[in-house]
């Protein structure tokens, strides 16, 4: 059985045409992208590396990593987001290889082929996130790094990521997130270790509604990113 939630795919298919509109529902992704790319680049040194972006959507992160000198492959199961990613690539001239395939299928085809694997803002949208993490471990080279991000599961995360972001501030469309699918850092850490990945670092992403700015912080109560590494 494929590790795909078709309702989640349909949700992003409907919004895909606005993926690169910086004032659309995807504004938060555009706003946090420089912070995420810098954090990854500082730890992985993207230039000259082979990178797989799992759950690439319309290619915001994929293109940014390619601009840093990485050879990037982006995979997603959404047909419309991938079409948008390919169209934007023609406009930007940034080379990314986009494929419609799951991480698990990709791991069967290309095990141990990538220096770096990223899987950001995707794990909370699949039925079995631990399966995706196991696939990421299989895809990365020995000694390679896997970067993951998701949303913590606690009352504060519900207040900020669902009530605040979707209903009060209207940063995201209502129904973007299902609180039950949010993932605690302890759970993400356990799944990573079970897959054979060592957790190296964790950082939070916080939003100030007054300044409308995001920043990296030690507060992992809501959005957070994790750096992991496969044994050499």
Swiss-Prot record:
One Pfam assignment: Methyltransf_23
Pathway: Cofactor biosynthesis; ubiquinone biosynthesis
Keywords: Methyltransferase, S-adenosyl-L-methionine, Transferase, Ubiquinone biosynthesis
UniProt keyword Transmembrane present: no
Gene3D superfamilies (UniProt xref): Vaccinia Virus protein VP39
Reaction(s) catalysed by this chain's protein: a 3-demethylubiquinol + S-adenosyl-L-methionine = a ubiquinol + S-adenosyl-L-homocysteine + H(+); a 3-(all-trans-polyprenyl)benzene-1,2-diol + S-adenosyl-L-methionine = a 2-methoxy-6-(all-trans-polyprenyl)phenol + S-adenosyl-L-homocysteine + H(+)
Membrane-crossing segments per the record: none
Superkingdom field: Bacteria
EC number per UniProt: 2.1.1.222, 2.1.1.64
InterPro entries: SAM-dependent_MTases_sf, UbiG_MeTrfase
Keyword presence, Glycosyltransferase: no
Binding site for S-adenosyl-L-methionine: 36, 55, 76, 120
GO MF assignments: 2-polyprenyl-6-hydroxyphenol methylase activity; 3-demethylubiquinol 3-O-methyltransferase activity; polyprenyldihydroxybenzoate methyltransferase activity
GO annotation (BP), single: methylation
Described function: O-methyltransferase that catalyzes the 2 O-methylation steps in the ubiquinone biosynthetic pathway.
Stored NCBIfam families: UbiG
Family designation: Belongs to the methyltransferase superfamily. UbiG/COQ3 family.
Name assigned to this protein: Ubiquinone biosynthesis O-methyltransferase
Species, as recorded: Pseudomonas paraeruginosa (strain DSM 24068 / PA7)
